[in-house]
Amino acid sequence: MQTLDPVTPALLPLRRVTRPVQVGALTIGGNAPVVVQSMINEDTLDTPGAVAAIRALHKAGCELVRVTVPSLAHARALERIRKTLEDTYRPVPLVADVHHDGGPIALEVARHVDKVRINPGLFVFRRARLGDYTAEDVERARAQIREELKPLVDVLGAQDKAMRIGVNHGSLSERMLYIHGDTPEGMVQSAVEFVEICEQLGYHNLVISLKASRVPVMIAVYRLAAKLLDARGMHYPFHLGVTEAGDGEYGRIKSTAGIATLLADGIGDTIRVSLTEDPLKEIPVCYGILQALGLRRTMVEYVACPSCGRTLFNLETVLHRVREATRHLTGLNIAVMGCIVNGPGEMADADYGYVGKTPGTISLYRGREEIKKVPEARGVEALVDLIKSDGRWVDP
């Protein structure tokens, strides 16, 4: 279960208006919640391994799963993967990741997945050339893109399936680099070119991503894209992510810095936190970002002071015990405060409060109301009992 934070709409900028795009049973954009997605590491030719990885991600909360499709054989394997999922588990919305010379691969895989991701810099792959680009060269390149893209657009449109135009900073076409340089403008124009062709072909089931590995570049390009595309009436949803963010604490910090900044601006409709780790570890970070911004409530929101000389109990230990006892609940705000100074005032928005009163004694609050004082040794147990008495407890 998830809820929206009632405080958030009044504090954050209005969310960018985007057209809803259907991806299987999911909706990306419009008024739909921000969608969480990830990508499996397994070879798509390994059907049992791929199915197991997709299931594990989906059970962990990943709503949209991407798989790599580097060849026609991999594209055909998606038929087996999808059927196995439906027969042994349940339908899971799938995205196929297509890159170099992607036309034939994308056409095949479009039959088996809900969305196809193409990379504008590689979809019609041409080796770098020497010399200038004339206007005729540019128009010839656009004609080649249209020729390659039209069959895919026709197939996807006939099935009401989606496409992600996924621009990467590190793989802009040589033509775009020549015209615009290695700039956010070049990334945006790379996406705009493909959007224009799709629109000319009457296809609008589009999601757009513009990823970079440097957070300032990523933020700048999405902000520019929102401005330029919206000015042209291209109100397509955005997929946010910092590509190649790395691992560990810093990888999470980089992803959060980029994704959360844009979401706080009202930009973004689906997110992926890309880590050089097991993809399962990406999912809690995604939901943590959305929870912190109040965009989705999928867990308890904990408020706790950082501790100081006034603290009347071991705050770190008690917070851990409270979290372990209540972490399975959804939509509650629980505050753990070390003393009365930071207690009632700082936890005014909390549903329940656990506050140090005197040495060895804590006070439990419901909202702003002090309910009872109990020995510290029984504090967590008494908090659980209070939640149960209010009918807001569910067994884990």
Curated annotation (Swiss-Prot):
Keywords: 4Fe-4S, Iron, Iron-sulfur, Isoprene biosynthesis, Metal-binding, Oxidoreductase. [4Fe-4S] cluster binds at residues 305, 308, 339, 346. It is an enzyme of class 1 (oxidoreductase). The keyword Iron applies. Its EC number is 1.17.7.1. The keyword Metal-binding applies. Binds 1 [4Fe-4S] cluster. Pathway: Isoprenoid biosynthesis; isopentenyl diphosphate biosynthesis via DXP pathway; isopentenyl diphosphate from 1-deoxy-D-xylulose 5-phosphate: step 5/6. It catalyses: (2E)-4-hydroxy-3-methylbut-2-enyl diphosphate + 2 oxidized [2Fe-2S]-[ferredoxin] + H2O = 2-C-methyl-D-erythritol 2,4-cyclic diphosphate + 2 reduced [2Fe-2S]-[ferredoxin] + H(+). GO terms for biological process: isopentenyl diphosphate biosynthetic process, methylerythritol 4-phosphate pathway; terpenoid biosynthetic process. NCBIfam families: ispG_gcpE, PRK00366.1. Belongs to the IspG family. This is 4-hydroxy-3-methylbut-2-en-1-yl diphosphate synthase (ferredoxin). It comes from Gloeobacter violaceus (strain ATCC 29082 / PCC 7421).
